[in-house]
């Protein structure tokens, strides 16, 4: 396992759309391990592959309920709304209020290639939305609440 360098705000790669993961192989499993180590080292709760320079649809999340791997995640359903403060490991100097759903149902593959369906609430739901945005080249600063201004 290795700590990878996190791309920072202004890096063009963070604005690109990630490609679907076609196969789960040793390289991808190593990337997953590295992403968890990088995220934990930076005291984060989520990390998307583009943040470490890889344009693949892969995110890792741990909001305190254990590590979760989402390969090719797809949000199926959302409900509720809440505005809360978010930060991002790629924009360490900034936080802001972002409106997100309070409930998310998503499907993805896990690291074994099995399809999983996750129902998440509150911080976990927020993390899934935030990290999935990264896969589409969207950063939390693009979604700041009206009161924050852009």
From Swiss-Prot:
Q: Name one GO biological process term.
A: co-translational protein modification
Q: Which cofactor does it need?
A: Fe(2+)
Species the sequence originates in: Clostridium acetobutylicum (strain ATCC 824 / DSM 792 / JCM 1419 / IAM 19013 / LMG 5710 / NBRC 13948 / NRRL B-527 / VKM B-1787 / 2291 / W)
Checking CDD domains in the record gives:
Pep_deformylase
As for what it does, the entry says: Removes the formyl group from the N-terminal Met of newly synthesized proteins. Requires at least a dipeptide for an efficient rate of reaction. N-terminal L-methionine is a prerequisite for activity but the enzyme has broad specificity at other positions.
Q: What is this protein called?
A: Peptide deformylase 1
Q: Write out the transmembrane intervals.
A: none
Q: Which GO MF terms does the UniProt record name?
A: metal ion binding; peptide deformylase activity
């Amino acid at each position: 396992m290795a700590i990878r360098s996190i791309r920072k705000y202004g890096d063009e790669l963070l604005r690109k759309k990630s490609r679907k993961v076609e196969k789960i192989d040793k390289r991808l499993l190593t990337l997953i391990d590295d992403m968890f180590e990088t995220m934990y080292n930076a005291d984060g709760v989520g990390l998307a592959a583009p943040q470490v320079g890889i344009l693949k649809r892969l995110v890792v999340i741990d909001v305190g309920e254990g590590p979760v791997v989402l390969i090719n995640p797809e949000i199926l359903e959302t409900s509720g709304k809440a505005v809360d403060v978010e930060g991002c490991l790629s924009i360490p100097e900034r936080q802001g209020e972002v409106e997100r759903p309070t409930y998310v149902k998503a499907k993805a593959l896990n690291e074994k290639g099995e399809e999983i369906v996750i129902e998440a609430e509150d911080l976990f739901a927020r993390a899934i939305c935030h990290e999935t945005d990264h896969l589409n080249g969207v950063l939390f600063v693009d979604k700041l609440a009206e009161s924050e201004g852009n």
